[in-house]
Each structure stands twice: as structure tokens, then as C-alpha cells.
Amino acid sequence: MEAHNASAPFNFTLPPNFGKRPTDLALSVILVFMLFFIMLSLGCTMEFSKIKAHLWKPKGLAIALVAQYGIMPLTAFVLGKVFRLKNIEALAILVCGCSPGGNLSNVFSLAMKGDMNLSIVMTTCSTFCALGMMPLLLYIYSRGIYDGDLKDKVPYKGIVISLVLVLIPCTIGIVLKSKRPQYMRYVIKGGMIIILLCSVAVTVLSAINVGKSIMFAMTPLLIATSSLMPFIGFLLGYVLSALFCLNGRCRRTVSMETGCQNVQLCSTILNVAFPPEVIGPLFFFPLLYMIFQLGEGLLLIAIFWCYEKFKTPKDKTKMIYTAATTEETIPGALGNGTYKGEDCSPCTA
């Protein structure tokens, strides 16, 4: 198993017992624990009726899946060609581009006032579709770059575990909201505190585990690629959803889902498919990508919040006037904020 025209093996070794140290185990446990509470808290913001609406009228979901498995793999492939990366570097980027959406997108969608029901449905469907789409896309795009059978390295077990870690806590949160809504705010507040503490622990343990090794992956071309990939995903995800006339909440949701990748699955494939002397420091490319997608996502959230802050005071009077006028002139207005005969499709602009 080797890439065509691959350069000489990297003079690189992973830290001793990498992936099997106590700190690695602690990091894995904390990540699962944190993900559970993230999904539980997000589940408390969802409703079965709205999830059903997205599934029965899957316009937003279909556009999101096209963006996820159309834009990101093609972006990774094109960036590899534009920057004339070595074949092994192009492969590492391609694996990241072919991965499904990550759970970070759900947090970003919440911060961007997106449609959380669509966000969770998208993450679930994207991960489920990865069972077939990842091997197909890796087979299509890796031809001519890699001699081995990369599609057989897809971590199906990891994909199923990702599905379970999304579906179970979200379902608990949804049931809690419908059956015991009085406890919902305590769960969300407690969850946020636990997530914050876990985030600090994850940051510290990641720094201990990786150390200076990630510096080997920080070449100018890889930095450029890992910074452009999430940005292009965020941008084109928004543009595509705007072209199909999704509303603002759904556009922001599709944008976040497209730009955020499941870097854990990407790391698993690189670890399984290539020995350290072949993949070298590129083993840490998914972590580099995660740093940039986190930074760019937070920047977009900050820009959105600033926009909301400056926009709201100016539009508030207009909104109040419009609401009052509507109630007076349209007797068919309903108490839930919709109107008789109005299209209630969750993503209609």
C-alpha cells in the first residue's frame, strides 16, 4: 500500500504508546461524556413535530446532504490539485473532505440561531449516509493517487458509534422536553457547566498527548489548505441553500453543517490505512483542520452576533408595527404565529 509517486518515508515517529496511554484513555472517555451532554442539551431544544416536518418535506435535508457530500470532497480534491500537494498529503486532505458532518456543527448552529431540528437531523443522516458515501467517494477521488483499496478502510464501527452517541441523548432530551418541561432548563444549565469543564480538560489533555508533534504538520501549504477547506464549506453551503430559497435559519444551519467535518473518523482512517512511516506528521492533519474550523466558526458566530446587535434595535419598531397591523387586517392569524393557508414548510424562505 503506497501512493503513486510518493516521496521517501517521513523521518517521523509518534510518541511512545501513542493512543494507548492513560491520558489517551482519559481523553476518549471525557470526549464521549462531553458529547453525551452536548447532545442531551441540544435535544432539549428539539421537537418531534418539527423533526417530522423536516423528514416529510426534506428539501432542506436534501440540499444539506448534497452540500456535505458534493462540496466538501470536491473542495478537498481541487485544493490538492491547486496547491500541487504530494499524493500522500492530498490523500489525507481527501479523507477529511469525504468524512460526514461533525457534532461541532450542532453547537455552531445553536449559537447562530439556526434550526436545531434540521441540524440534528442533518448530522444523523449525514453520518448514516457515510456508511455508503465514504467508500464511494474515496474510491472515486483517490483513483490515480493511491494503489491500495482505501474504501475498505472506512471505520464502520466508528460511524455506528457516532450515530448512537447522537441519537440516544437527543432522544432523551426530546422526551424530557415533552414529558417534563419543568426540568429542561436545569438540564441545559447543568449540561453547559459540564461541557465547559470537559472542554478545559480536553484542551489540557490534547496538549499533553500531541505536544509538539502537530508542528510537523504545520507546513505553509497544509495550513493554507486546512484554513480554506472549512471556509469554502461554510460559504458554499450558505450560497447553495440560498439558491434554493431556504430561510435564514436553515441557510445558517446548512452552512455550519457543510463546513464542519467529523475529524475523529478521518483520524481513524488515516491510522488504519497507513503506517506512521508513510503517513508521518499528516496523521495530525485532522487536528489542524479542527483548529481552523473551530476558529473560523467562532469568527462567523461573532460576526453574526454583531450583526444581530446592530440590526435588532433598528428593526424592532418595524417588527412591532407589522405584527400589530397583521393581527388587525388578517383575522385568520393563529395563536402559534402562523396563518391559515400559510406554507409552514420548516425551511421555506
UniProtKB/Swiss-Prot annotation:
Q: In which tissues is it expressed?
A: Expressed in liver. Expressed in placental trophoblasts.
User: Where is it localised?
Assistant: Cell membrane
Q: What is the lineage of its organism?
A: Eukaryota, Metazoa, Chordata, Craniata, Vertebrata
What protein is this chain from? Hepatic sodium/bile acid cotransporter
Effect of changing S267F: reported as:
In FHCA2; protective factor against hepatitis B virus infection and chronic hepatitis; unable to transport taurocholate and cholate; does not affect uptake of estrone sulfate; does not affect localization to the cell membrane; disrupts interaction with HBV myristoylated pre-S1 peptide
The domain of life for this entry's organism is Eukaryota
Query: Looking at the record, which disorder is this protein connected with?
Result: Hypercholanemia, familial, 2: An autosomal recessive inborn error of metabolism characterized by persistently increased plasma levels of conjugated bile salts apparent from infancy, fat malabsorption and impaired absorption of fat-soluble vitamins, including D and K. Most patients are asymptomatic. Some neonates may have transient jaundice or transiently elevated liver enzymes.
Outcome of substituting R180Q = Decreased function in taurocholate transport
Gene3D superfamilies given in the database record? 1.20.1530.20
Q: How is its activity regulated?
A: The transport of bile acids is sodium-dependent.
Keyword field contains Metal-binding: no
Per the record, membrane topology reads: Multi-pass membrane protein
| Organism for this UniProt entry | Homo sapiens (Human)
Example of a GO MF term: bile acid:sodium symporter activity
- In which family does this protein belong, per the annotation? Belongs to the bile acid:sodium symporter (BASS) (TC 2.A.28) family.
Q: Which residues lie on this side of the membrane: Cytoplasmic?
A: 45-47, 113-115, 180-183, 244-247, 312-349
Q: Which reaction is the catalytic activity of this chain?
A: taurocholate(out) + 2 Na(+)(out) = taurocholate(in) + 2 Na(+)(in); cholate(out) + 2 Na(+)(out) = cholate(in) + 2 Na(+)(in); estrone 3-sulfate(out) + 2 Na(+)(out) = estrone 3-sulfate(in) + 2 Na(+)(in); taurochenodeoxycholate(out) + 2 Na(+)(out) = taurochenodeoxycholate(in) + 2 Na(+)(in)
